[in-house]
A protein has these predicted regions:
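Short, strongly hydrophobic alpha-helical membrane anchors
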Residues: 1-20
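Structural signature of hydrophobic alpha-helical transmembrane segments
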Residues: 17-29, 199, 405, 481-485
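Hydrophobic core segments of alpha-helical transmembrane domains in multi-pass membrane transport
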Residues: 28-40, 54-67, 204-213, 282-290, ...
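Transmembrane helical segments that form the transport core of multi-pass membrane transport proteins
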Residues: 93, 355-460
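Hydrophobic alpha-helical hairpins/lids featuring a short glycine-rich hinge
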Residues: 159-233
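Juxtamembrane inter-helical linkers in multi-pass membrane proteins
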Residues: 224-259, 326-346, 388-395, 406-410, ...
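Alpha-helical membrane segments and immediately flanking helix-loop junctions
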Residues: 234-291, 343, 432-516, 520-528
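Long, contiguous bundles of hydrophobic transmembrane helices that form the permeation core
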Residues: 306-359
Length: 536
């Protein structure tokens, strides 16, 4: 092999570009807005300026955050001086595999080697120490120019933040329980139980304490107040509903109403609907940390939560347009946290709140997973009965499988919705199953299903039973990012109703439609992600 070549080889971006799936996602935005309008209570009263402005705000924020993934700051990577180190990097950061492929092609062309793919090149080196040594010298002589931040500097920063949280949690749990969470085999029931008990739950507790401290120091107040100010000025929404929408991005459906507690009793029906729908369309910061620890992209989770705020306002104002004059039409400030005496007290209160949330998560998962098993058992029994009846009246054994499961039913019912968001037809049934699980069960179980598919693909590669493209994984990450499920209706009626008992009747009337609106808002953010994916 010759080595008379430039010392570095640059790599182009590996964006997928605009495709027909992006167009389907764009169509999905229009159809979801049309569906929402059809479900609305006062269609002639819809403020279309608010709708258009809110949609443009959502797209602008999403485009800014998506485009940040291109801020990768390419640089020479002289530390990648061998095939082994290049292979290790590709396994750690699969996103750069396309760029490594280009690097190999350029190396082959510049050294008069036959053009090979990355997999073929690695296979050709197996069992040949001399060829491997030559390849190592070749890579050392012309190190690849790879991005410092393959997912972009913003996503890198967010993921590093949640990684720091995970490391802090592991430090705490390792000290208290004398073990290190994160077992290699996630499918072993005992190891899975240990991973959940000593990994996920401590994350909720620690993040609760962290958020409480930030709230006490005024950081959260500043962030929420700023987001609310932007939405209020651009969309013309009232101060109370703008604050609630901004608070929902970070603190969740049960805590956000506390931010506007003095105003809940005097809110209009449109504002109440907006308050509830905002809770259904977002998740809390604690759960964001949990899902990131499970392997879901922290950058996409944060982006989804941010752009869901204007999406929730848009859908809420189509479903229940404002026909009254809100009390806080001008502006309203987020109240200060006067409950904690000092930072230590704030951390202690946050840890206690996190523990209550963790217990709620455990109870919720046990109850709903048990109910799913019960429903599946009933459906299986009905299927056995139908199968027997069909076979008894038929001359030949039926080839139709009547053994149904709740996930199988979801896959059929929600597959059209998955397609509408821009998911490839071949992946719509599995995506529909996950979407149905989110709405009927909860987002936690749905994310666990998505993570399980991702883990199987990582372990088995092309041999994995279920294959979901990166585009589909991104779209589902956005679609699942919300509390829009049937159980949350009761949670919100109980939580908000405790703040204003006289409005419990209104909350009960608005609950189901607000939850459906929250699901539509989540799907709307997924459509926006589908439009921008591969373009920015």
């Amino acid at each position: 092999m010759g080595f008379e070549m430039s010392p570095m080889i640059g790599l182009a971006s590996s964006g997928e570009g605009f495709s027909s799936l992006n167009l389907i996602s764009l169509l999905g935005i229009g159809l979801l807005l049309l569906l929402t309008w059809c479900l609305g209570s006062a269609r002639s009263k819809v403020n279309w300026r608010l709708v258009v402005t809110g949609l443009l705000l959502q797209i602008a924020i999403a485009a800014l955050l998506f485009n940040s993934q291109s801020w990768t700051f390419p640089a020479a990577r002289p530390e990648i001086s061998s095939v082994a180190k290049l292979t290790e990097l590709v396994e750690q950061v699969p996103e750069i595999s396309g760029q490594v492929e280009q690097y190999i092609q350029k190396v082959a062309a510049s050294d008069s080697m036959p053009a090979r793919s990355w997999a073929e090149w690695r296979q050709s080196l197996e069992g040949s120490p001399e060829a491997l040594a030559d390849a190592d010298r070749l890579i050392a002589a012309q190190p690849p120019v790879l991005p410092r931040f393959p997912r972009g500097i913003l996503f890198y920063g967010v993921e590093q933040f949640f990684s720091l949280i995970r490391n802090c949690v592991e430090a705490g749990t390792s000290f208290v329980f004398r073990l290190n969470p994160g077992p290699e085999d996630k499918h072993d029931p005992l190891l899975l139980l240990k991973a959940f008990t000593f990994g996920v739950i401590p994350t909720v507790i620690f993040f609760g304490a962290l958020m409480s401290v930030l709230y006490y120091l005024g950081v959260m107040r500043w962030v929420v107040q700023g987001m609310a100010w932007v939405m209020q000025r651009l969309l013309g929404t009232s101060g109370a509903e703008s604050l609630a929408a901004a608070a929902n991005v970070l603190i969740g459906q049960t805590e956000a109403p506390l931010v506007i507690k003095p105003f809940v009793g005097s809110m209009t029906r449109s504002e109440l609907n907006c308050l509830m729908l905002g809770g259904f369309a977002t998740i809390s910061g604690s759960l964001m940390a949990v899902f990131a620890s499970l392997g879901v992209s922290a950058g996409h989770l944060l982006t989804a939560s941010i752009i869901s705020a204007p999406a929730a306002l848009v859908i809420a104002k189509i479903l229940q347009p404002e026909t009254e004059r809100p009390l806080t039409l001008g502006s309203v400030e987020m109240p200060r946290n006067n409950e904690a005496v000092n930072v230590i007290d704030a951390a202690a209160q946050g840890a206690s709140d996190g523990m209550r949330l963790a217990i709620n998560v455990i109870a919720m998962l046990i109850a709903f997973l048990a109910l799913i098993a019960l429903v599946d058992a009933v459906l299986w029994g009905i299927g056995e009965l139908v199968q027997g009846l069909v076979n008894s009246v038929s001359s030949s054994e039926s080839r139709v499988d009547y053994h149904w499961t709740i996930k199988g039913i979801f896959s059929v019912l929600f597959a059209p919705l998955a397609w509408l968001m821009g998911i490839a037809t071949s992946e719509c049934y599995k995506s529909g199953e996950i979407l149905g699980t989110k709405m009927v069960v909860n987002e936690f179980v749905a994310y666990l299903d998505l993570v399980d598919v991702m883990d199987q693909m990582k372990a088995d590669g092309a041999n994995a039973k279920v294959q979901l493209s990166e585009r589909t994984q991104v779209i589902l990450t956005y679609a699942l990012c919300g509390f829009s499920n049937f159980a949350s209706i009761g949670i919100q009626i109980g939580g908000i109703g405790a703040l204003a008992p006289e409005r419990r009747g209104d909350l009960a009337q608005l609950g189901l439609r607000a939850m459906i609106g929250g699901m539509i808002a989540c799907c709307l953010t997924a459509c926006v992600a589908g439009v921008l994916y591969g373009v920015l």
